[in-house]
Amino acid sequence: MVLCMSKSGGSLTGRADTVLVILLAALIFGGALMFSSAAVGLLARGSTHISGVVFNHFALGVGLGLVFLVIGFSIDYRKWRIVAPYLFGFALIATLMVFIPGIGMEHGGGKRWIDLGFVTVQPSELLKIAAVIVSAAYFAALRAEASTWKGLAAFGGIALGPALILAMQPDFGTLGIIVISIFAVAVAAGVRLRDIGIMGLAAVGVLLLLTLTPKYHYVFERIDTFINPAAQSAQGQGYQIRQSLIAIGSGGMFGRGLGQGIQKFTYLPEPMGDSIFAVVSEELGFLGGGICIGLFLLLGLKGYGIAARSPDLFGGLLAVGISTYLVGEAFVNIAAMLGMAPLTGVPLTFISQGGSAMLVSLASAGILLNISRKFPKR
């Protein structure tokens, strides 16, 4: 489906879309409440770093992220088209730096972080938005030629760099979000689904071959856990999913109450990270979990609406990519916690622990807000 833009010129209204502001505020404020509740679980686990964890999340993640949101909102989104290739190149180089001894950090079998001394950063988070921006810029330049072989080449070429680097880390969760986001931009630009499907099947074939090697066998284990969770051992690959489902189910319709969850204290792995949606559902119930899902769904619909009303093709494609990235990441996380998809390790947007993810997500939201200011005069 090709994205159709308004032909009239854009004008800076000075005001962001009100509904978008409300949705973002609800997710950010609600996410802060749920993170605070989930962080209490560290006390029962004997952690002495709860103050540092909370400070890093709110000061470096939310606080600095809101500053970047304001910056993203203040910069004319069309300027990102000029710097797109340089930003993408910088993000690729930064993501490669995780392999430099003494700088790169390894955790849980993956090399995904850079140690700056006073803070650690995950450069692949920057790669998400950089890939979206460069995709929007390139496909906007192609215009009608997006439906030709040039469009397919652009899709494959932009995805190839992140694919090679993230496969070495390995981090297929982040790679999946990048590919989904680029895919959305490509489809909106007019690239044929059949062509992308053929390329996608080839990529899946390569991934299946990789799972036969020891380094990537964990991918096969996660898929096997998703297909047959009952066959896993009590503390095996299916443990996190089972504990997540227990937490979600025990919340009932209205939940145990904010801060009253039990699973976060000892049983639920990563209650502030991947599993925070389970904490939301246990404490706020089916109603609270449903509201969380509904907010993300509305955010996606609003983002695509902004894309359709954008005065130029680049703005429309950029809005599609950002909306897909922010909402797609959330739905992938939630689906895994509900046992509807394999575990990927991607965070719940605006809610999970992770300063780099929070900062980039908020900056991306700022860019989307700026696009919403550019509606043509009626």
Q: Which ranges hold each PLM region?
A:
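Flexible extramembrane loops and terminal tails that flank transmembrane helices
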Residues: 2-21, 37
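Positions that flank functional sites
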Residues: 42, 263, 296, 356
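Glycine/serine-rich anion-binding loops at beta->alpha junctions
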Residues: 117-127, 168-170, 252-257, 345-360
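Hydrophobic alpha-helical transmembrane segments of multi-pass inner membrane proteins, especially
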Residues: 21-29, 33-37, 43-240, 278-339, ...
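A juxtamembrane structural motif centered on a specific transmembrane helix
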Residues: 1-8, 331-378
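TM-adjacent membrane-interface loops and short helices in multi-pass inner/ER membrane proteins
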Residues: 226-273, 286-288
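Short linear Ser/Thr-Pro motifs
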Residues: 36-40, 261, 352
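Transmembrane helix boundary and interhelical junction motifs in multipass membrane proteins
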Residues: 171-176, 256-261, 271-273, 290, ...
